Amino acid sequence: NETTHDIYAGNMKINYQANKNLTFNIGADASYVEEEKDYQSLENEKSSATSRLHAEETKLAAFAGCNVSIAKLSAQLGMRFESFRMLYRDAISQNSLVDKTYRHFYPFFSLSLPVKNVEMGLSMTTKVKRPSYYELRNSEEYFNRYSIEAGNPWLLPQYTTDISYSLQWHQLRFSVDYQRIK
């Protein structure tokens, strides 16, 4: 059994300070991951099973945001856009096992306001958890006569929106968090 990986990644970020209370930032990320797995399993002396799995991930993202201060209020807000492609195929038969593309916007913001000895904060972020190749596989693995494991090529990514409100007074912190998962 042999596995090889090729990984390429890069990012760029530009900040522009308009004045002492306002900063803008824009940027982009890109990554490419390629993986090749060769499996050879000898089932008995007369036969063997061979597979070569090829996986590719391509992610392109762009983001923009700003930091602003107005009196005692500090705010950060922005947006990120991601395009993500996942390709997983049997390199011997050229059968595509998984070919998925996801495109999504991820907004975020945070506000911070001190009032006397109390620091108040409110924030919202959006995140994604994509299924792995292993979870998306359409093959079955038999561990013994009582145990089998299989993937599900129709799994979808999980998007989570986190909203948090917090109060801090000296060393005492109180927070309320809400999560929406879809």
Task: Name each region found by the language model.
Residues N1, E36-E45, L87-N95, Y133-E141, ...:
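Outer-membrane beta-barrel translocator domains and adjoining extracellular loop/strand segments
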Residues S51-E57, L97-K100, V128-I181:
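Outer-membrane beta-barrel signature, preferentially recognizing the C-terminal barrel domain
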Residues N1-R89, P114, V118-E119:
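Face-selective signature of the C-terminal outer-membrane beta-barrel domain
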Residues Y16-K20, N67-S74, F105, S110-N117, ...:
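Outer-membrane beta-barrel strand-turn architecture
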Residues I26-Y32, L77-S83, L111, L122-T126, ...:
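Transmembrane beta-barrel strands of outer-membrane/channel proteins
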Residues N1, H104-F105:
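Generic preference for hydrophobic/aromatic residues in regular secondary structure cores
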Residues F24, Y39, F63, F81-F84, ...:
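Phenylalanine-focused residue identity feature
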Residues D6-M12, T58-A64, F105-L111, M120, ...:
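Hydrophobic, lipid-facing positions within transmembrane beta-strands of outer-membrane proteins
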